[in-house]
């Protein structure tokens, strides 16, 4: 079976197994998803959701994040790990949102990746799940591991894996494909093709 055939088989099988696959970060607006995704680096979605429950009560706007005392923000996000860097990135990101985007989250890859703490993965999460735009494939640890095990790529870096997946998958499945593999990785923990 070629890589293209494997990708096609997955696009056919995974929606039957995971028809409800979606982003498991809790959010109500683009800013909340942006902040939650920054916090999700090296952290579980479950932990992030516990943290953001309180964080989203304290900070409601980009200006709130930009102006909160750094020590207070660090304390709120401490349990997500790497909390000083994450707090610093969130504040710088939100200050840029206020200064350059009227406090709103932009809906382009270029504008998002220009923000502190926002790489392609975070931008793809926001674009795909808030704005319905498929600019790329989210490559987290599950997608990275399973794409290799399922023979979709031989590459090891997220950027190269993303490029390989974008070549193999129809654009309309880029966002969903990540959700399917993430759900598969979290629920099954192994990379057999679902039947």
Regions found by a protein language model. Name each.
Residues 2-195:
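Catalytic cores of DNA base-excision repair glycosylases
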């Amino acid at each position: 079976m070629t890589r293209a055939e494997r990708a096609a088989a997955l696009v056919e099988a995974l929606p039957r197994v995971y028809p409800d696959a979606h982003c498991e970060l809790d959010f109500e607006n683009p800013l909340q998803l942006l902040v939650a995704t920054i916090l999700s680096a090296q952290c579980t979605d479950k932990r992030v959701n516990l943290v953001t429950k309180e964080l989203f009560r304290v900070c409601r706007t980009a200006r709130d994040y930009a102006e909160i005392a750094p020590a207070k923000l660090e304390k709120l996000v401490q349990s997500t790990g790497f909390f000083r860097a994450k707090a610093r990135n969130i504040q710088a990101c939100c200050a840029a949102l206020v200064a350059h985007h009227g406090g709103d989250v932009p809906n382009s890859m270029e504008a998002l990746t220009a923000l502190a703490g926002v790489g392609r993965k975070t931008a793809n999460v926001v674009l795909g799940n808030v704005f319905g735009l498929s600019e790329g494939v989210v490559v987290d640890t599950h997608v990275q591991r399973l794409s290799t095990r399922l023979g979709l790529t031989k590459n090891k870096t997220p950027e190269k894996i993303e490029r390989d997946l974008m070549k193999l998958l129809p654009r309309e499945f880029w966002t969903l494909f990540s959700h399917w593999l993430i759900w598969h990785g979290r629920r099954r923990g192994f990379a057999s093709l679902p039947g």
